[in-house]
């Protein structure tokens, strides 16, 4: 891809219907405007956009892409106009903006609007490259920055609108020759109009020139008085409106107070009657329970072996924003959770089941947590890694780790691995210090998933899983996937498992590296995976955008249970001593056990 503002002409420039500007996008996401009120903005792509970036409803590049309840992406306007999905015929309801697709579209290169003109086909909203115009190609997301300062932008002479239209690059030369330069004191009555030479001569004899300081001071005072009067008018109007509202509220309160006293009297009588009835019912229930206990004591209890079912045993509440990561410190029965509220909470999972402490230090969303020894490492959208001492729960070091958010962390062999945009950094752990050992490159997108198992590091990015030898830090194998970016990875004794952006879970044989199965069932991005292994079986847990957790038996590759207790997307998982912890966008952490 060429850099922004690089002169380039494409012989196969593609003309498509114009996209809306960013400001119009935000307005039209709230209001639905008729077609005739839209003015097409010139848009000519330098190269043919990918078909994956085109809406299946309007067949054009996405405009304000959104994800619908069926899991597909459409233009917001198309999704609001259409009733059913063209792929699976499901009802269309907008769920959330598709930020990832919007960012990809913003990276596409287009021709400057001042280098385009209407195509000769006569179709409205269709444009082609103008060889006489601006030669630059720019990223779609940066078009405003370039076009606002483009030398080919049409401008008007500031001296006289009757001057012929100009290009910005010709304005300075025109001003030197313009015959319509007015005296700076024209607003006070000076009638002079001339060119640059006569303008300078006129100023020497202009009767207003000697009074310019006095005139300016007078203008300033008039302006201040006008502003003060406007403010007073606003204050008077506000006070009048408040006075009217207060009068209305007082009248309403008087009326409602009388009604509430009447209702209160009625409720007191009714509560007294209900209380007597509840006491009678409680007495009857106690008698029945005593009778049932007596009958049970006369019998013999038999054994019952139910199917292993996970149930929600409790909920940790305290975060003020979505929970994005979880980590368990088994030696102390502590659970750490990172959130959009920029904090890390420490939960006791053994005795009190309460928040022990809230760790503060990050300036952005906490996206990743990892434990090595007695140290907790946290990665954030503020591009830093903070080192915490678990013994006293204090911050001991802060490292500026990446130029972009730190998405994931994992430790192995006394090294810490951190994932960000197109890079994995390897850090030697030396006490409380992190020494950069190497940066692993050659990655095609965000690294959102890292797992260390035995002597290998597994990293997930866009449709790719790379396997690295931890001892040599060399990439020894690449697994190709489908379904968009890899958001989660888990490794069992026999399988490599990954969750993707487009709802899928792929499974590979760990020895042959051959894909053996694709697990389906989720209807949203698979954000997290976790494994619980016993001598008898291995279970994989998946957490998804669709607010559910699924339990998969790796013996027969089927879903044995679906857990639905969260009120938002489930984003993080952690396991400890047969227990499963799940964090979600609803700001809670839930505990699951058999």
Curated annotation (Swiss-Prot):
Q: Where are the WD repeats?
A: 318-357, 361-398, 401-437, 439-478, 481-518, 521-562, 565-593
Q: Which reaction does it catalyse?
A: S-ubiquitinyl-[E2 ubiquitin-conjugating enzyme]-L-cysteine + [acceptor protein]-L-lysine = [E2 ubiquitin-conjugating enzyme]-L-cysteine + N(6)-ubiquitinyl-[acceptor protein]-L-lysine
Record EC number = 2.3.2.-, 2.3.2.27
Cellular location of this protein?
A: Cytoplasmic vesicle; Cytoplasm; Nucleus
Which Pfam families does this entry report, sorted A to Z?
WD40, zf-RING_UBOX
Q: What are the recorded GO MF terms, alphabetically? A: ubiquitin-protein transferase activity; zinc ion binding
One Gene Ontology term of the biological-process aspect is: cellular response to interleukin-6
Location of the region described as Disordered in the Swiss-Prot/TrEMBL record: 1-33
Which controlled-vocabulary keywords does the entry list? Apoptosis, Cytoplasm, Cytoplasmic vesicle, Metal-binding, Nucleus, Phosphoprotein, Repeat, Transcription, Transcription regulation, Transferase, Ubl conjugation, Ubl conjugation pathway, WD repeat, Zinc, Zinc-finger
Zinc finger (TRAF-type) locations? 146-216
Describe which pathway this protein belongs to, using the record's wording.
Protein modification; protein ubiquitination
Role according to the record = E3 ubiquitin and SUMO-protein ligase that plays a role in different biological processes such as innate immunity, inflammation or apoptosis. Potentiates MAP3K3-mediated activation of the NF-kappa-B, JUN/AP1 and DDIT3 transcriptional regulators. Negatively regulates MYB transcriptional activity by sequestering it to the cytosol via SUMOylation. Plays a role in the phosphorylation of MAPK1 and/or MAPK3, probably via its interaction with MAP3K3.
Record family assignment: Belongs to the WD repeat TRAF7 family.
Self-association or partners: how does it assemble?
Homodimer. Interacts with MAP3K3 and promotes the kinase activity of this enzyme.
Q: What is this protein called?
A: E3 ubiquitin-protein ligase TRAF7
């Amino acid at each position: 891809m060429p850099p922004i503002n690089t002169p380039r002409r494409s012989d196969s420039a593609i003309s498509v219907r114009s996209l809306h500007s960013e400001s119009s996008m935000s307005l039209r996401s709230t209001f639905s405007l008729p077609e005739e009120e839209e003015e097409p903005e010139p848009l000519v792509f330098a190269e043919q956009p990918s078909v994956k970036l085109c809406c299946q409803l309007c067949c054009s590049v996405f405009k304000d892409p959104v994800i619908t309840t069926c899991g597909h992406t459409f233009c917001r306007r198309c999704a609001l106009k259409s009733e059913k999905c063209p792929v699976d015929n499901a009802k269309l309801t907008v769920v959330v903006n598709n930020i990832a697709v919007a960012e990809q579209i913003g990276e596409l290169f287009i021709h400057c609007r001042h280098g385009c003109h209407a195509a000769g086909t006569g179709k409205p909203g269709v444009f082609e490259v103008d060889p006489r115009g601006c030669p630059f190609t720019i990223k779609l997301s940066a078009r405003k920055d370039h076009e606002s300062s483009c030398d080919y932008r049409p401008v008007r002479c500031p001296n006289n609108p009757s001057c012929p239209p100009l290009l910005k690059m010709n304005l300075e030369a025109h001003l030197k020759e313009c015959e319509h330069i007015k005296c700076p004191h024209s607003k006070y009555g000076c009638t002079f109009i001339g060119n640059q030479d006569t303008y300078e001569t006129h100023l020497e004899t202009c009767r207003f020139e000697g009074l310019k300081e006095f005139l300016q001071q007078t203008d300033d005072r008039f302006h201040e008085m006008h502003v003060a009067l406007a403010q007073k008018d606003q204050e008077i109007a506000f006070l009048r409106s408040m006075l009217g509202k207060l009068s209305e509220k007082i009248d309403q309160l008087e009326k409602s107070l009388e009604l509430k006293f009447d209702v209160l009297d009625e409720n007191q009588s009714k509560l007294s009657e209900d209380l007597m009835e509840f006491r009678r019912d409680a007495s009857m229930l106690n008698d029945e329970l005593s009778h049932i206990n007596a009958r049970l004591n006369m019998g013999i209890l038999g054994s019952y072996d139910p199917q292993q079912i996970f149930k929600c045993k409790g909920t940790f509440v305290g975060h003020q924003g979505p929970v994005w990561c979880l980590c368990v410190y088994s030696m102390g029965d502590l659970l750490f959770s990172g959130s959009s509220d920029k904090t890390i909470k420490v939960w006791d999972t053994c005795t009190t089941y309460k928040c022990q402490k809230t760790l503060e230090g990050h300036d952005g969303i906490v996206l990743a947590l990892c434990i090595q020894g007695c140290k907790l490492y946290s990665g954030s959208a503020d591009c830093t890694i903070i080192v915490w001492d678990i013994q006293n729960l204090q911050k001991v070091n802060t490292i500026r780790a990446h130029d972009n958010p730190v998405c994931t962390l994992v430790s192995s062999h006394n090294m810490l691995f951190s994932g960000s945009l197109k890079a994995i950094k390897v850090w030697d752990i030396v006490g409380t210090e992190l020494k950069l050992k190497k940066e692993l490159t050659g990655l095609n997108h965000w690294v959102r998933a890292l797992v260390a198992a035995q002597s290998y590091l597994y990293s997930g990015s866009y449709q790719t899983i790379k396997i690295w030898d931890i001892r040599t830090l060399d990439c020894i194998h690449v697994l190709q996937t489908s379904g968009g970016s890899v958001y989660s990875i888990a490794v069992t004794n026999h399988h490599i498992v990954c969750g993707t952006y487009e709802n899928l879970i792929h499974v590979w044989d760990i020895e042959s590296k051959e894909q053996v199965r694709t697990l389906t069932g989720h209807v949203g991005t698979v954000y997290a995976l976790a494994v619980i292994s016993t001598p008898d079986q291995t279970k994989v847990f998946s957490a998804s955008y669709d607010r559910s957790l699924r339990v998969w038996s790796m013996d027969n590759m089927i879903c044995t249970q679906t857990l639905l207790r969260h009120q938002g997307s489930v984003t993080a998982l952690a396991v400890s001593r047969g227990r499963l912890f799940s964090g979600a966008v609803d700001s809670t952490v839930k505990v699951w056990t058999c």
